[in-house]
From Swiss-Prot:
Protein's recorded name: Small ribosomal subunit protein uS11
InterPro entries: Ribosomal_uS11 (IPR001971), Ribosomal_uS11_bac-type (IPR019981), Ribosomal_uS11_CS (IPR018102), Ribosomal_uS11_sf (IPR036967)
Family stated for the protein in its record: Belongs to the universal ribosomal protein uS11 family.
The keyword rRNA-binding appears for this protein: yes
Molecular functions (GO terms): rRNA binding; structural constituent of ribosome
PANTHER family: 40S RIBOSOMAL PROTEIN S14/30S RIBOSOMAL PROTEIN S11
Subunit annotation: Part of the 30S ribosomal subunit. Interacts with proteins S7 and S18. Binds to IF-3.
Organism: Xanthomonas oryzae pv. oryzae (strain PXO99A)
General function of this protein: Located on the platform of the 30S subunit, it bridges several disparate RNA helices of the 16S rRNA. Forms part of the Shine-Dalgarno cleft in the 70S ribosome.
Keyword Zinc-finger (UniProt): no
HAMAP family in UniProt: Ribosomal_uS11 (MF_01310)
Key words, A-Z: Ribonucleoprotein, Ribosomal protein, RNA-binding, rRNA-binding
Pfam families on file: Ribosomal_S11
CC per GO annotation: ribonucleoprotein complex; ribosome
């Protein structure tokens, strides 16, 4: 019987990126932190739901802090040293996510608010009656 042919596989080389972009999407229900390179290719991401928080605890500043820390530690493997932070959304985890990325050890070059603001676009949802 013939021996099975062994395939030679090359180890995937991780590219080294020195500066990246951290996209923080802070909604009222969740916070998503994505770290990309300058071209927009994702290096790592984390959400407050994926960090183990469920329900109303997902929308807390502490959950955003944990998610940003998780995404930041994963991006350290690529050699990222400095970050530009782009914040989108009105959620409660905006500032704590940026503070957490700073505590991980990144040099934050600038912080940009890219929240989309309509110039009288779509009709907003009806007001809540509690």
């Amino acid at each position: 019987m013939a021996k099975p042919v062994e395939k030679k596989t090359k180890k995937k080389i991780k590219r080294v990126i020195t500066d990246g972009v951290a996209h923080v999407h802070a909604s009222f229900n969740n916070t998503i932190v994505t770290i990309t390179d300058r071209q927009g290719n994702a290096l790592s991401w984390a959400t407050s739901g994926g960090a183990g928080f469920r329900g109303s605890r997902k929308s807390t500043p502490f959950a955003a802090q944990v998610a940003a820390e998780k995404a930041g530690r994963a991006a350290l493997d690529y050699g990222v040293k400095s970050l530009e932070v782009r914040i989108k959304g009105p959620g409660p985890g905006r500032e704590s996510a940026v503070r957490s990325l700073n505590n991980v050890g990144y040099k934050i070059t600038n912080i940009i608010d890219v929240t989309p603001i309509p110039h009288n676009g779509c009709r907003p949802p009806k007001k809540r009656r509690v």
